[in-house]
Amino acid sequence: MPITELLEANAKKYPNEVSLVEINPDIQEKRRVTWRDYELIESSPMCHYRREITWHVFDEKANRFAQLLISRGIGKGDKVAILLMNCLEWLPIYFGILKTGALAVPLNFRYAPDEIEYCLNLAEVDVLVFGPEFIGRVEEIADKISQNRLLFYVGGDCPSFAEDYDKLTANCASLAPGIPISDEDDAAIYFSSGTTGFPKAILHNHESLMHACKVEQKHHGQTHDDVFLCIPPLYHTGAKMHWFGSLLTGSKAVLLKGVSPKTILETVSNEKCTIVWLLVPWAQDILAALDRGDIKLEDYKLDQWRLMHIGAQPVPPSLIKHWKEYFPHHQYDTNYGLSESIGPGCVHLGVENIHKVGAIGVPGYGWE
């Protein structure tokens, strides 16, 4: 069963329920910054504070982009790269690509122009979808990368060297393209950007993506009533594959574009989040703010928050001990994986093993 069928099933079963929410904290950058200055999560001052879509609209947007790609000759075996900050359009674009039988190629938003060009050529990308944060970088290489390659722009004020995604998809049919897709078909190319040099391409099929959905749900017990708070970038297998648990259960997820302790707790409270994935520095910042009295737990509604998990880096046992002093009822898990192993969960601590915090964990579901 290809992963696109999960989206279509959710659109039929929960058409009017919220699937995705984007929270964009109202942080205005007063000084001029270059693309190199962007933090891990960058707010978009020109966007609305909060946007949401239902499962029906999610699927409809994916279908419209799929129809646009098909109308331009994109189909099975072709590659479509995504160069976007986290936003409400990111996942519908990803699934629109998959619905055509093409391969999605997420790109790290920290790539310099030469790295973008390198990845596009290495993966033999046919289409690049990019957002406003990347106009300068893409323009620098536009003459070279636009030869025999489509450039679609997501956002206002489309640059002259690209085509307007919003205007084009608005005129496309919202019907599913109906392209037959099997579990063995190639689905995505991810780039592993380690310390050994330029990015390396990793190929995954639809069976791998479906396995990632099952791993996440098995490890963290997502139900339809859960609400997942996602802060890290979606181009990374970690963030997207943790969200796959929400996809499998048809539950709501929140994309937060800010990492301050106040912003995180406000979002958990306002959106009724039950599962939050943090990185060590963000958890440390929350605890430090609580210790100083900068924020107070009684100012937020956090009773529904049941699970906090961390991955991607070593977790000091003292951090989780301190965390449990403020959140004694929280479940906790540590997740590790590789882009090659389709994201987190290759090994994990397990929510029942909090007394073993500091250990790398045990083989995850399906990895025994």
Where are these regions (language model features)?
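Conserved AMP-binding/adenylation subdomain of ANL enzymes
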Residues: 210-227, 235-275, 289-290, 296
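Conserved AMP-binding/adenylate-forming core of the ANL superfamily
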Residues: 16-87, 91-95, 112-117, 166, ...
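Conserved pre-ATP/AMP-binding loop-to-beta segment of ANL
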Residues: 16-18, 170-191, 198, 221-227
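ANL superfamily adenylate-forming
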Residues: 24-51, 135-183, 289-293
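Gly/Ser/Thr-rich phosphate-binding loop
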Residues: 248, 273-278, 287-355, 368
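Conserved structural elements of the adenylate-forming
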Residues: 59-65, 183, 188, 202-223, ...
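Structural core segment of the AMP-binding/adenylate-forming
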Residues: 5-7, 71-72, 99-167
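Conserved adenylation A10 loop of the ANL superfamily
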Residues: 47, 189-201, 213, 353
